[in-house]
Amino acid sequence: MRVGVDLIEIARIRRALERYPRFRERCFTEAERAYCDSRPNPAESYAGRFAGKEAVGKALGIGVARAFAWKDIEIVGRPKPSVHLSGRVRELAEKTNAGAIDLSMSHSRELANAVAVVGD
């Protein structure tokens, strides 16, 4: 079993959404954008999903240091999020025989966090 954890300030994601219009398209799939944009506070949802992507990357051992496309990790579903891998991330997961991925996300007023557990 491998675990990845991430914590991010919601204000940081809110600023990225406001300052960099391409941030949404570069980091989130169409389904993720539709979900987040439908929420009362989209920045909280985007921050949770961003933290989720980071946590999954860390649990898979690819973290921030190895290049991958953010959209290669897609987080969908509610209330229990599910993770769909594609592209390079999927290839790396298959090479390492990664099992099922469980993900938990949460947020407070200021922070979003995620914990990913990858089975062996």
Task: Annotate the PLM regions.
Residues 1-120:
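Core catalytic alpha/beta fold that binds nucleotide/phospho-ligands
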